[in-house]
């Protein structure tokens, strides 16, 4: 299937060990609900949520999706809790983190960090494990 122009391969990929575990990363994000400091920085927000202080090595979410697709790390269907959800909003690819049950958290297009139903943001999405291969 596809997220815009990206072809998605279904394959089992093991969870990645990040500096901050999934629940801690989600708590970090939920503690920032309402903050407008992350406007237009959804990729940086997710990278920092999972404990990476330095740049991810990707220019933006579109660059990340391209890299993840090339490495066959994208999946379709309902994203599990803690997965990164890559979605089309307007003319850009954005990223948020799955809370499970179709909800995501992150700096959304409207500005502040929020919790939203993914279906209200986009019907064109894929997900990946929280993988930042170039982060430190």
Q: Positions of the model-derived regions?
A:
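Secreted/periplasmic proteins that engage bacterial cell-wall peptidoglycan
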Residues: 1-90
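Generic detector of ordered, mature protein regions
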Residues: 58-67, 92, 97-98, 111, ...
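Structural recognition of the beta-strand scaffold that forms the well-ordered cores
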Residues: 82-87, 95-98, 104-106
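Aromatic- and glycine-rich peptidoglycan recognition patches
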Residues: 9-15, 26-34, 98-136
